[in-house]
Amino acid sequence: MKIAILNGSPRKENTAAMAEAFRQGAEAAGHEVEVLQVGKMKINGCLACEYCHGKGEGKCIQKDDLEKLMPAYLESDMIVFASPIYYFAPTAQLEAAWQRVYCIGKPAKATKAALLLSSASGFYDAAIAQYKGFAAYTGLQDMGVCTATGEENKSEAKLAEIRAFAEKL
């Protein structure tokens, strides 16, 4: 299975460690994995101009780093979203990517999704609801959510749990 991990964090700390643990577990199980650093990309929010559903034929009118993300999004069997919680939500970069893939509607190939979240405080409910809504709308089967809070972030026990989760896919 081909897996794309969309890391929404602009930093190299907790979420990056979770994404790396997932990658290690998935590759150990024989899957092909690509990690995309969405948190470092310049992706604008959706303009709701509907160009993509008319003249654009599935392509967004905006020219930004979404173009770097789309090949992996379109060619993967599974998409893993990874993000720290910033003010009760995934990062703005990941949210912009979620909005902008509206241009294609549903993923061309992907059938599965998972979510990795890190937080200092553990306020995950809004981000999980947003992910589940996105998965339901796009027809992706939710394979699970892994969270790490405070001291758990980057702990070997938590990273081992994430590796094991990825190996079982």
Please place each PLM-identified region on the residue numbering:
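Short, glycine-/small-residue-rich phosphate/pyrophosphate-handling segment
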Residues: 105-146
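Residue-level recognition of beta-strand->loop/alpha-helix junctions
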Residues: 37, 146-147
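N-terminal beta1-alpha1-beta2 submodule of the flavodoxin-like/Rossmannoid cofactor-binding fold
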Residues: 1-82, 88-99, 103, 153-169
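A short acidic, glycine/proline-enriched capping/turn motif at secondary-structure boundaries
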Residues: 86-87, 121
